[in-house]
């Protein structure tokens, strides 16, 4: 039995939401989109992420969400994404979110280089999730 039924009045077509983002990415010639806002994660995954989390959306194919390792299994269970597309990071060398996501993104890019879209802005709501200056600098240096 399918997990979702398109005839259900509460059905939300999450794969189509991803395709819509990918269509917009193509218009802007983006190879990867790095989402960090709480609303973006919920809107694309159908899961709640109480910890710092990110979603990497490639130009084609399924996105991958990254969250704190202790919450990854629960987030994967809540999401329409399978467990191979909801990964955990940990505050240890090589397993922190910047290192893990950077390596993941580089594998998606031809020759490890490409155009990456990020979420940027400001909000009065603290957990909004825009990239912090620290995260932006670390990602920029790691992906340069």
What residues fall within each predicted segment?
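A composition/biophysics-driven feature that prefers long, compositionally simple stretches
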Residues: 1-144
């Amino acid at each position: 039995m399918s997990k979702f039924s398109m005839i259900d009045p509460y059905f939300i077509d999450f794969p189509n939401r991803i395709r819509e983002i990918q269509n917009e990415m193509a218009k802007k010639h983006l190879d990867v989109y790095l989402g960090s806002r709480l609303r973006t994660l919920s809107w694309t995954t159908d899961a709640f992420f109480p910890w710092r989390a990110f979603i990497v959306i490639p130009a084609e194919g399924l996105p991958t969400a990254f969250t704190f390792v202790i919450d990854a299994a629960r987030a994967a269970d809540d999401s329409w994404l399978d467990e191979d597309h909801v990964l955990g990071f940990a505050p240890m060398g090589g397993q922190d979110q910047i290192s893990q996501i950077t390596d993941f993104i580089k594998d998606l890019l031809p020759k490890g280089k490409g155009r990456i879209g990020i979420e940027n802005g400001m909000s009065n709501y603290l957990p909004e999730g825009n990239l912090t200056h620290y995260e932006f600098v670390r990602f920029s240096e790691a992906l340069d």
